[in-house]
From Swiss-Prot:
Sites where the protein binds GTP: 234-239, 253-259, 278-281
Needed co-factor(s): K(+)
Protein's name in the database: tRNA modification GTPase MnmE
Record has Nucleotide-binding as a keyword: yes
Length: 437
């Protein structure tokens, strides 16, 4: 069967899309997924006119134009209870490149087209199966490299952040409904405590959202914490980078000033991604290249979440940053002062203690409330916009101005989830009041 023998779809009907759901690397099985109105006709054409039972694994011989393409498992997934909300199917194929290419050719010939990046999830959002926050979480889940990233992405995909923002939006709707009543029915002589209650609720919302903005756990989990190793030349910074990471990423010599530019690599500690940065030795110098390396080192120190400040046996302690952990190095030559952590990268002494201290510091940075944290700059910008309009609403002298600022705050929250709905506001207004009946 070819495309010409399939029933025509209306011009405004989304086209069937397909894509390989598994990776391109060599494997036993490859999963081809498809979605869109008309998926049933395409699957029937491939399965010799027999559509598999919904959501039941079926072994089928796939054919096109009389040619056997593969012996595969077919899954028919009718909407709306599918990932995209549309009719769709999966083909679990043998993963040979020739088979995958031939199946793709057949799907194209039958009227489907290759999906654009993220198009399956985009359709899920458009069909209301996911909101924007959940869609972003799916991307984060696919990209997750650490246990903390996996847990956070899964929590957001399950709707934790969406529920928080929806709760704020619902409370704003109720405030706005009362505010509209004050504007539209001024002769009803509503008690003064009604307006006072509106201001109090706005203050609570503003406090909660402002606290949410201060919580940067989500961004730290997604991007990783920055741990900068700093100190004077030849104090053991590169040796510590290699010891912690278990690599030879940095060149180690007895010559001072070997590291001219920052060397960075990723390291996972307790399921949290850390960005370890080895920096140029800090000292006075006339060398322009070394001076630039030192300038960059100081920049990294200022930006760091944690600074491992290494101090040699003959040095005094000078504080570099409020985030630093002072560490005496080369304790195989001279012991560390009482109360100060000492390490030797030669013998390994003190490295376990350093990992424990660093683990505790990471736990402190990741500690916070039970509320889900924001995870992207888009979320931060949206919440900041909502807070700004709340502040304007709280201090507005005219009821109409307050109402407009509340609408703008709701709009900012709605853009975060993708749920911007005027009808929901009307439902809140007419559902809460019986004035005028």
């Amino acid at each position: 069967m070819t495309r010409s023998s399939l029933p025509d779809a209306p011009d405004n009907t989304p086209q069937v899309i397909f894509a390989l759901a598994t990776g391109p690397s060599r494997a036993a099985i490859a999963i081809m997924r498809a979605s869109g109105p008309g998926s049933d006709a395409i699957l029937k054409a491939l399965c010799n006119g027999r559509l598999p039972a919904p959501r039941r694994v079926s072994l089928r011989t796939l054919r096109h134009n009389g040619e056997v393409l593969d012996h595969a498992v077919a899954l028919w997934l009718p909407g709306p209870n599918s990932y995209t909300g549309e009719d769709g199917f999966e083909l679990h194929l043998h993963a040979g490149p020739a088979i995958i290419a031939r199946i793709a050719d057949a799907l194209t010939d039958l009227g489907a087209r290759p999906a654009e990046p993220g198009e399956f999830t985009r359709r899920a959002v458009q069909k209301g199966r996911l909101d924007l926050l959940q869609a972003e979480a799916i991307a984060d889940l696919v990209d997750a490299e650490t246990e903390s990233q996996r847990k956070q992405a899964l929590r957001q995909a399950d709707g934790a952040l969406s529920r928080l923002y929806d709760d704020w939006a619902q409370r704003l709707r109720l405030v706005l409904a009362h505010q509209e009543a004050l504007i539209d029915f001024p002769d009803e002589e509503l008690p003064q405590d009604v307006e006072d209650g509106l201001i109090e609720e706005l203050s609570k919302l503003q406090t909660e959202m402002s606290a949410h903005l201060q919580d940067n756990r989500g961004e730290l989990m997604r991007q990783g914490l920055t741990v900068v190793i700093a100190g004077s030349p030849n104090v053991g910074k590169s040796s510590l980078l290699n010891a912690l990471s278990g690599t030879d990423a940095a060149i180690v010599t007895h010559r001072a000033g070997t590291t001219r530019d920052a060397i960075a690599l990723d390291w996972v500690l307790d399921g949290v991604r850390l960005r370890l940065i080895d920096t140029a030795g800090l000292r006075e110098t006339e060398d322009e290249i070394e001076a630039e390396g030192i300038r960059r080192a100081l920049f990294h120190v200022k930006q760091a979440d944690v600074v491992l400040h290494l101090i040699g046996p003959d040095e005094s302690l000078d504080t570099l940053s409020g985030q630093e952990i002072p560490i005496r190095t080369k304790i195989d030559i001279a012991p560390a002062p009482p109360g100060m952590l000492g390490i030797s990268t030669q013998s390994g002494e003190g490295l376990a203690a350093l990992r424990q201290i660093l683990s505790e510091r990471v736990a402190e940075l990741m500690a916070g409330s039970a509320a889900p944290p924001l995870t992207r700059a888009r979320h931060r910008a949206g919440i900041q916009e909502a807070v700004t309009h709340l502040d304007h609403a709280r201090t507005a002298t005219w009821p109409e101005l307050r109402g407009e600022e509340l609408r703008l705050s709701m709009l900012a929250l709605g853009r975060l989830t993708g749920r911007v709905d005027v009808e929901s506001l009307l439902d809140a207004i007419f559902g809460q009041f019986c004035i005028g009946k």
